[in-house]
Amino acid sequence: AILASSGKKVLTNPTGSNFTRGVAASIVAGSTWSGKLDYDIAIIELDEAYAAKFVELVRPRASLILNVMRDQMDRFGEIDHTAQLLEAVVHATTDVVILNKDDKRVNALQSSTQAEVLFFGVSSKLRDVFRSDDELHGEIINADEYAIVELRSMSDEVITLYIDGKTYRYPLSLYGVYNAQNATAVTAMCFALGLHPKDIGRHISTVTPAFGRGERIYVGSKRVILQLVKNPGGFRHALLGGKSIDAHHVMIAINDDYADGRDVSWLWDVDFSSLAQSSIITTGVRAADMALRLQYDEIETLEYERDLKTALKTSLLLTPDDGTLLLYTTYTAMLKLRTLLSEITEVEKI
């Protein structure tokens, strides 16, 4: 969105479908009838496993590696294997690699490339918020590398970044603390691509949530917030962001399809204590598993209901007019929930 606002014609895969089929669909949709791609640049979000295959065919000029988290362990086996897949991406990159200095597995990838390496990160006072996977239940270790862009402070509406020796304040209209880190990473990439920090800030303030990532949908006067969750770190950040929302009801939708990850044991690595006083329904294929996980944190649910449509209907009834319903949901459940919501209200088409 930032590059598009700066005048670039950008090809991307906006639906969140980051397997081969999603990228291929975006390329086909963006092509002319003769197969030409009339764009200045392609910004592609890729699943780790498919990224390693993709770069065998198309070597990226630039790559951005945010973090390595336990995600879909049924596919990847263990987190160090995920890091090896990302190493292939870094090795294939020709011009510049942007790495998170605060994630030790990402940091270590700097030795795997001949391209220029730049780092982004957060200040030491924010490290407790943005813990790496090893630090979720362990000691925080600060890296020595210089960050070309560093997140110094954040609020619900403004982030302060230290960019190449100067301080900038950017308005941010994106829900969730994780978006402050995302904005930091994106700023580093845009800066590496030649955009001026003031231009980045002007454009980043206009970025709206990607669908399902803090997306707001209104059902009458009721506000529904869709928040995608898929690993311990992401769910932790989503819950931290949820503290600033006066949600009247919470629904947690957990599926275990291939795109979600069959193994949902990662739920046991999330601290759900912030939901202790919430009105909660769990739903999806793993509704009972989610309810059991909450019970171990001594959090009672109103009910667990596998059927998404029934659970959504009940949750909307439990949300008062002018109130907020907060939905934490895995990927395939999120797609279904957006479809269900589109049957009763206006939902942006992707």
Regions found by a protein language model. Give the residues of each.
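Phosphate-binding loop of NTP-binding sites
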Residues: 1-116
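Short glycine-/acidic-enriched loop or helix-start segments at secondary-structure transitions
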Residues: 22, 53-54, 74-75, 107-110, ...
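Acidic, Mg2+-coordinating active-site environments of NTP-dependent enzymes
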Residues: 68-222, 301
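Short, acidic/turn-prone active-site loops that include or flank metal/cofactor-
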Residues: 15-18, 67-71, 122-125, 255, ...
